[in-house]
């Protein structure tokens, strides 16, 4: 078991999805259901600005961070694919506010035994309580230390989207225009409230905020 400590000097563009996740969860971004502002918590802007810089480093186009903390950008189509319908990918930056959401310490468990997972805070997760754990035998798991949330909902989605962008670029994979958007306040049901569809620019889009690998939900009400 490894306890991850983020170092601000280890920022770089070439990253795997889990490395990006470990970076993003160091940002505290709980939304606030009692707020009348958008975003409901100013701290969400800190992550948004960081992501904007990363998107600029990936040479995305049409990058816009608006005054309500919606962040948009595009990966232009490769030559010959300019007329392919644009596809979009969306994830949210906020986390839940009703659990401990600060001083998050990611823990990496390699080669999981498939039976039980003991976290540093003294909590044990067992396959009897959480049967899905049995399907993760011999895989690498990323959790919190058990005293806080991790924030993978939905920072894992953000990490997956930007890693996909980098993979498309460096793999020289042909594609149409890829539109991405990172939104605030999804956890309090307001994520789509001020979403700028025209700025986003996609013909079709997926929200990367799921559960089981390979699962697709073809509609949602506020994400």
What do these predicted regions represent?
Residues 11-13, 74, 115, 123, ...:
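Intrinsically disordered, low-complexity regions
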Residues 4-5, 42, 46, 90, ...:
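Intrinsically disordered, low-complexity regions enriched for glutamine and histidine
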Residues 15-140:
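Acidic/His- and Gly-rich active-site-bordering loop/insert found
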Residues 13-16, 57, 68, 173, ...:
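Generic structural signal for short, solvent-exposed loop/turn connectors between secondary structure elements
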Residues 134-223:
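Acidic/histidine-rich catalytic neighborhood of metal-dependent amide-processing enzymes
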Residues 1, 19-22, 53, 159, ...:
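Active-site-proximal helix/loop capping residues that flank conserved catalytic or ligand/cofactor
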